[in-house]
Swiss-Prot record:
Belongs to the TolB family. InterPro entries: 6-blade_b-propeller_TolB-like (IPR011042), PD40 (IPR011659). It comes from Agrobacterium fabrum (strain C58 / ATCC 33970) (Agrobacterium tumefaciens (strain C58)). This is Uncharacterized protein Atu1656. Signal peptide: none annotated.
Length: 293
């Protein structure tokens, strides 16, 4: 990978080990707080609907971190699914976890399991599929599916298991997440050459460009309050969404207005791949990575 002129790749410690810092940023007060730090690699925090814990992945497994008292990780029983990636989330009622795991087929498949733990239930027959967001009513979810090497956005009705294709092969389409009113799915797409933020109606009927920036914009997450979207931006010369780079964490209005850089951090892949807002929409969780000295 060619080094960026703005952001420089940093070296890691012995053996490439990293320190994960799970943090929370308040968009109203502009204050940050550290929840927990560890020498292990943790990724993609989801905030529980009751506001009590974060759900993250590490080494193929899921863990809960309490936001009250001792934040030491509690492993979730995911049954046979032991190669979970960072595309996971919690249903709006808190009863289900969605995971993306490749143990069964050697490719990422989407499963649902009780949030109390248990045997995962396969949802996607077409593979690979990477989960990214729940609909506000909890009746469907959206995901990135790769079919014949084409990246597109899909949704699935949970009861029927019917897969609906929402985008149609224009560039790479990835990272979808629902708006809180359930009318739009925000996603990132390279259809114009540079990865930017777009949105599509939940029935696929209309696609709109949201960002027009000089960066590679990834993983848009609309806030539950319906006024802001948080996302990660790489330098324009960075392909895909690698880890171990300085990236910008950006905030904007739902229509793409008032884009602002909140802060830079060392991370990228794993920082905020899946929904990460607090239930009230005032805060979001993310992971910052530090080289181990």
């Amino acid at each position: 990978m060619r080094q960026s002129t703005l952001h420089t790749r940093l070296s890691t410690g012995p053996g490439g080990s990293m320190r994960s810092s799970i943090e929370i940023f308040n968009i109203r007060t502009r204050k940050m707080r550290v929840v927990w730090q560890t020498p292990e690699l943790f990724e993609a925090p989801n905030w529980s609907p009751d506001g009590k814990y974060l759900l993250l992945n590490s080494e193929g497994l899921l863990y809960r971190l309490s936001l009250a008292g001792d934040p030491s990780p509690e492993k979730v029983d995911t049954g046979f699914a032991t190669i979970c990636n960072n595309d996971h989330g919690i249903s709006p009622d808190g009863a289900l976890y969605a995971i993306s795991d490749k143990v069964e087929f050697g490719k990422s498949a989407i499963y649902l399991l009780p949030s109390t733990g248990g045997t995962p239930r396969l949802m996607t027959k077409n593979l690979p599929s990477y989960w990214h967001g729940w609909s506000p009513d909890g009746k469907s979810f959206t995901y990135c599916g790769i079919r014949d090497q084409v990246f597109d956005i899909y949704s699935m009705d949970i009861d029927s298991g019917v897969e609906t294709r929402l985008t149609h092969g224009e560039g790479r389409n990835d990272g979808p997440d629902y708006s809180p009113d359930g009318r739009w799915i925000y996603f990132n797409s390279s259809r114009t050459g540079q990865m930017q933020i777009w949105r599509v109606r939940v029935d696929g009927s209309s696609v709109e460009r949201i960002t027009d920036s000089a960066y590679g914009d990834w993983f848009p997450h609309p806030s539950p309050s319906g006024d802001k979207v948080v996302f990660v931006s790489y330098d324009a010369d960075v392909f895909d969404h690698p880890r171990d780079l300085d990236v910008r964490v950006q905030l904007m209005d739902m229509d793409g207005g008032n884009v602002e850089t909140l802060f830079d951090l060392f991370g990228g892949q794993g920082t905020m791949n899946s929904p990460n807002w607090s239930p009230d929409g005032d805060e979001f969780a993310y992971v910052r990575y530090f080289p181990v000295e």
